[in-house]
Design a protein with these regions (language model features):
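Alpha-solenoid helical repeat scaffolds
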Residues: 1-7, 16-529
């Protein structure tokens, strides 16, 4: 009868009949149907009435608790939701409590007042925080809620409490990794201590990635080497290790690690493994190409899965074709990329422009970007690329105008400050202003090797050779790069350390033999490697 009323357009009457039947029969399916009908009719109070009746009639049914909690949150009755959460956790079997506690931040995510949500959850989990079997999970959840509320000190304290409750629990360490950038003083020693022992491979990998971002590459290498030794079947460990070795110019070691990743990933049915496989194969192709092994590079690219990122794959293929002297084919590969949305269309434009810029087709790159920017005039990625093209075209006023607009729109982004400062330094003009801009960039990203390179270069232009040498050596150690090698070698040469300069330039050639800055610098000093 209730369903007939619903079908005939009287959902209210149908709801009442079904709820009455549920009360008489104590049938959970009827209670759930009543709740669903009320929710479909956007009647939160009726849904809550049905869920509470369900809980009263069938107290052992935990599904009713879940509905009550979610409905109360939808009605923004946060304090009542906290009480419902406490009851819900308490009534679950012990084996299910930690998983339920871990899901709480997701359940409370829609609450607008994050501080109230965090306070409510901590109060609701009071018993779980004191119980040894649930304390680590509960403190982790409290920490996540405090983090989302912007209460960093409380999030840090929750992390410590969770770690103290159970040193083997992964939750507090995952939370610590998420807080490491915001609270390095507190989280760095905690993580370093934890990583001395045995941890899940995902956690050690996360810590290694954190170290790479600092950048503390030597420490990251140590963590990745241990990860590979302890978990040789963990494919992602080999991938990240190989990519880091490639980035630091250790190509033979990088190839060995990436080959191991390919072996593991190709044997896996995991879809996520295919993403890593594509990245590894493209990196192997790039290394083979750099060493002049062009047919081997083609073989690696031929193995890339069909569902790989089409823009990344096309870019790698175009780069290989370019090195083979097949420029028009390379350009066509990029032009034929199919895009499904605005974001992909922008990425396509950017890789096309970068290819044109690197191959000295600057007017074509400028025209391409101008057309794209008529459709997306506010796109900061397009603006950044336009600034680089303008610099190559020696349209310095237009370049500066674009970069200053970027500074206004993204004052927390160091790259526009660095780009303008470096351009001024490279042209040996307005050096005091260049230093100010680069110093501002370095405040925003103090560990960025490319910004350290820029500051070293402006110091050199200002005649501060000792400062320049120290900055450039630090930058090159952190990020071996052909352009940084060009700058460091020039400083060494001018300071009379010509043997050391030659060694640095040769190392730069191994990294990227066709780097314009490096080639021009060696030519200017008549250096023959």
């Amino acid at each position: 009868m209730g369903e007939l009323n619903v079908r005939s357009g009287s959902p209210g009457s149908g709801f009442s009949i079904i709820l009455d039947a549920a009360r008489k029969t104590r049938d959970p399916a009827l209670f759930q149907r009543a709740v669903d009908l009320a929710l479909q009719s956007r009647s939160g109070e009726s849904a809550l009435q049905a869920a509470q009746a369900w809980k009263s009639a069938v107290p052992e049914n935990t599904e009713a608790n879940r509905y009550i909690l979610q409905i109360l949150l939808a009605l923004n009755r946060v304090d009542e939701a906290g009480k419902a959460l406490s009851v819900s956790i308490r009534e679950l079997p012990a084996a299910e409590q930690n998983a339920a506690i871990a899901s709480v931040p997701r359940v409370f995510a829609r609450v607008q007042d994050k501080k109230t949500a965090a306070d409510t959850v901590e109060k609701a989990l009071a018993a779980a925080l004191k119980q040894s079997s649930t304390a680590a999970a509960a403190w982790t959840t409290v920490g996540r809620m405090r983090r989302e509320a912007g209460q960093l000190a409380l999030a840090v304290e929750a992390t410590r409490q969770g770690r103290a409750a159970d040193a083997s629990a992964p939750g507090p360490l995952i939370l610590a990794l998420s807080l490491a950038n915001a609270a390095p003083t507190e989280m760095t020693p905690l993580l370093a201590q934890a990583m001395k022992g045995a941890v899940q491979p995902e956690l050690r990998l996360g810590y290694a990635r954190h170290l790479i971002g600092l950048p503390q590459q030597a420490e990251a290498m140590q963590q990745l080497a241990r990860l590979n030794a302890e978990h040789p079947s963990f494919a992602d460990g080999w991938l990240v290790h190989g990519l880091l070795l490639q980035e630091t110019g250790k190509l033979a070691e990088a190839e060995q690690k990436l080959r191991q990743h390919v072996t593991l990933a190709q044997a896996s049915q995991d879809k996520e493994a295919q993403t890593g496989l594509a990245e590894a194969l493209m990196a192997l192709a790039q290394m083979a190409q750099r060493q002049g092994q062009l047919s081997q590079a083609e073989q690696w690219l031929a193995q890339v899965p069909a569902d790989a990122d089409p823009i990344k794959l096309a870019s790698r293929r175009a780069d290989l074709l370019t090195q083979q002297g097949r420029l028009e084919e390379a350009r066509q590969v990029l032009a034929q990329i199919k895009t499904n949305n605005t974001e992909q269309a922008t990425r396509k434009t950017l890789v096309q422009s970068m290819w044109l810029r690197e191959n000295k087709r600057l007017d074509e790159a400028y025209t391409l970007l101008k057309q794209a920017m008529t459709e997306q005039p506010q796109n900061t990625d397009l603006m950044s690329e336009m600034a680089m093209v303008n610099e190559k075209l020696k349209r310095f006023d237009e370049m500066e105008s674009v970069l200053r607009e970027l500074m206004k729109r993204k004052p927390e982004d160091p790259h526009a400050f660095n780009a303008l400062g470096y351009s001024l330094a490279d042209r040996n003009t307005r050096l005091d202003e260049a230093r100010q801009l680069i110093t501002q960039a370095l405040k925003l990203a103090p560990d960025d090797a490319y910004i350290q390179d820029s500051l070293g270069w402006v110091a050199f232009r200002q005649g501060q050779y000792a400062e320049a040498l120290q900055l450039l050596q630090t930058a090159f150690k952190a990020r071996p790069d052909a352009e940084i090698a060009a700058h460091l070698g020039e400083v060494l040469w001018v300071m009379g350390q010509r043997q050391e300069a030659g060694a640095v330039w040769r190392e730069g050639l191994l990294l990227k033999a066709d780097n314009d800055t490096l080639v021009e610098t060696m030519k200017r000093f008549q250096f023959k490697p």
